[in-house]
Amino acid sequence: MLTSLRTIFQEVNSARSLPEVLTIIVKEVRSEMNAGVCSVYLFDESDARYVLMATEGLREESIGKVRLSSKEGLVGLVAHKEEPLNLPDADQHPSFAYFEETGESPFHSFLGVPIIHHRRVLGVLVLQQENRRRFAAEEEAFAVTVCAQLSGAIAHAGAT
């Protein structure tokens, strides 16, 4: 996993735009984690919502269209609590919000990790799988490390 982290960080550091950074993140993390879905939701301060900005595994046409209020759904819960959420049956959680346009219905396992920069939640990285299971501690640690290291790149890319 360390080799994968190094590769991801090198690619992100050479990216020229926020969309490119996010595309690298979702593709590489999904591949390394062997997940069905990897998505990034970023906070849009103009309307206080988390917006699906990149995904590998959900319907591409849902990018930019899925918008959750700051405390809506599992994404909002992860952001609000500022800590990872690892669920084997996400659709059974009281905070679960289903968005038909994403095509996420076959995915049950959920790992959400906040992307935090200078104590400010920039967004949430989400991993999903079809089978019902908790993500392993090593997988969660990998996702947390990715978010911690990439928060600065996302903040920088969003500011330029």
Predicted regions and their residues:
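Signal-transmission linkers at sensory-effector interfaces
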Residues: 1-20, 31, 122, 153-160
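Short regulatory alpha-helical segment in sensory/regulatory domains of signaling proteins that mediates
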Residues: 9-14, 25-34, 42-44, 60, ...
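GAF sensory/regulatory domain recognition
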Residues: 27, 38-66, 91-93
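Short beta-strand-to-loop transition segments that serve as allosteric relay/switch motifs
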Residues: 58, 124-133
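Acidic/proline- and glycine-rich, intrinsically disordered low-complexity segments
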Residues: 60-85
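Signal-transducing coupling segments at domain and membrane junctions
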Residues: 60-62, 88-109, 129
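A short, aliphatic-rich beta-strand micro-motif
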Residues: 108-116, 124
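Allosteric cytosolic regulatory segments
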Residues: 144-151
